[in-house]
Amino acid sequence: LYFSIVSTFSVIASGRYEMAVVLPKTNEDSIRLVYLSVVFAFITAFVSLIVIILFGSEISDLLNNTRIQDWLILIPLSLFSVGVYQAFNFWLIRQKAFMASSFNKVAQRSFEGVSTIYYGLTNKGGGLIISDIIGRYSMLLIAIYQARKRGFFHVSFSWLEMKRLAKLYKSFPLNFGLSSLANSAGAHLPLLFISIAFHSLTVG
């Protein structure tokens, strides 16, 4: 259930501006689109945190799974990591750093695997969720380090420039955002409906 919720909303975590990162003529605009994506990812995570704080109990009741309530609070962390990583990954692809992008995935699975084994051996609850978060943030930190080596942070953070770019590429959140959310919801909502109609053990 947790991963279904995260997967549904992660496609719009950064407003789909991450898809525009490869398009600008200048590297400066490309980097500022990454900054813009990070801002949107933060907003998405913050809004989801407020919703979970206010309605976490109602959400878990709706999903017919009271045990998930304690883990819902981690959803903002997952959404933020996905949104930010997608932006940095597109920038690395723009730089033709394909090996770096592939290495990040390997690093994610490695950290995630070690963490999963640890939680499995110690019989601690929520191992899959925590391991997924550890893997994602490990991948994100490595991607940021790789971007730093390629001069990413030489470009200053500018609200004015990001506002200009947000308007220039507004079709991405307006068009791709809604369609991506609809497609993602179509793929994952059946699992949520099964949980509502039956029980979490049925869903797995």
Model-identified regions with their sequence ranges:
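Hydrophobic alpha-helical transmembrane segments
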Residues: 69-76, 102-152, 202-204
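Alpha-helical transmembrane segments of multi-pass membrane proteins
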Residues: 3, 8-9, 50, 54, ...
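Interfacial/gating helices of multi-pass transporter permease domains
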Residues: 1-10, 69-70, 130, 164-172, ...
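Membrane-interface junctions at transmembrane-helix termini in multi-pass inner-membrane proteins
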Residues: 20-29, 80-107, 117-118, 122
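Interhelical loop/hinge segments that connect adjacent transmembrane helices in multipass membrane
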Residues: 143-188
